Swiss-Prot record:
Similarity section: Belongs to the MurJ/MviN family.
Keyword vocabulary terms for this entry: Cell inner membrane, Cell membrane, Cell shape, Cell wall biogenesis/degradation, Membrane, Peptidoglycan synthesis, Transmembrane, Transmembrane helix, Transport
Protein name: Probable lipid II flippase MurJ
A biological-process GO annotation: cell wall organization
Subcellular location(s) of the protein: Cell inner membrane
Amino acid sequence: MANILGAGVYSDIFFVAFKLPNLFRRIFAEGSFSQSFLPSFIRSSIKGGFASLVGLIFCGVLFMWCLLVALNPLWLTKLLAYGFDEETLKLCTPIVAINFWYLLLVFITTFLGALLQYKHSFFASAYSASLLNLCMILALLISKEKTHLEALYYLSYGVLLGGVAQILLHFYPLVKLGLWDLLFKGLLGFKTKNTNKKEYRLNRAKKDLKAFFKQFFPSVLGNSSAQIASFLDTTIASFLASGSVSYLYYANRVFQLPLALFAIAISTALFPSIAIALKNNQQDLILQRLQKAWFFLVGVLLLCSIGGIMLSKEITELLFERGQFSPKDTLITSQVFSLYLLGLLPFGLTKLFSLWLYAKLEQKKAAKISLISLFLGLAASLSLMPLLGVLGLALANSLSGLFLFVLTIKAFGFQSFLGIIKNLKSWLVILFLACVEILLLLAFKSWVTHLYLFYYFQGF
């Protein structure tokens, strides 16, 4: 993408158009839906009927919303990129209309993935994101010789094709594990001729749906402060110089890799067992699992942060600097990436402790925490942007993560938290590994610099 679109007005247009669908993708994929759905699904006595109704309700609402945007996308385009001029808005509007349909596709993917989580099947969910990226890459390769505007249309349809591929990936495990039959039979259960059974199922479904939606909306808010903050940063960045939206997007994409690979993956895999342990009142088991996950995440995310900051320019250059992506774009993107990485530990560790809140069905408390950190982060963005420009937005995002972490730990309980982190041996191992990494990277950078200078002067 950086090779073909670079970091300018056309890349900004796509990132703005893809921002809202991508926001929903990250919110749903990172657990907001499953952390509300799974506890309700586990507790439901009519699992198939409950799940099928949830799926139909969401699909119906999202389809109508997508249709509304397709018929009149201008209002949403102005909302997403208020700082764009009229000509750029005109180019952006049809791209927004196409990409918005991905909302419906990503919900279906997330819904099917949540059902598979119940059966402890994570393969489809883990690999579905790669299908989206693959389809986007194929679309860009096909449009390589096209104009930038034509490439935007190819890329947008590539997003939709990726969404369909993600859904299809879930079908085989759904059928194999009997979940497809569960959904189908659950829906047919509402058509039974037995009046008593039908009345019981309808009443039970109403209660389950009411309980689910009561938890869902606070869960979305509570689990998506980072995504909403990033969304707001894109809107604010549209007032800055051309390319600012792209710098944020490219840096954030790399930042999301360790976050998704470790923090989100572990929290997603851990959530069903935490929810069941809480239901069975196994507090010691919960604390034991959280402690193991804590030290693993601290170690891995700290090493990723150190490595990413020390090699930020090299990583950005390797991934993006070709074609339309200039050395200046590399420098700014690498600086943004380094500032994003300051928030990797707090954002990643917050995912771990928020599990406890969601498993206890305390979504309202999580939503309150998220709102506070979101407003503090927004205030930081507006304060730092005039001083640091796009770098201020990245720094504010990391500060928002720190606020979120402190507030989540407060809700979890400082005494319980101190009990989890009390392990001197683990801390010493992490400190040793961090020191070794720093020394190795310093030696590596020095060696590469000397090698470059040697061959550079040899050329003369």
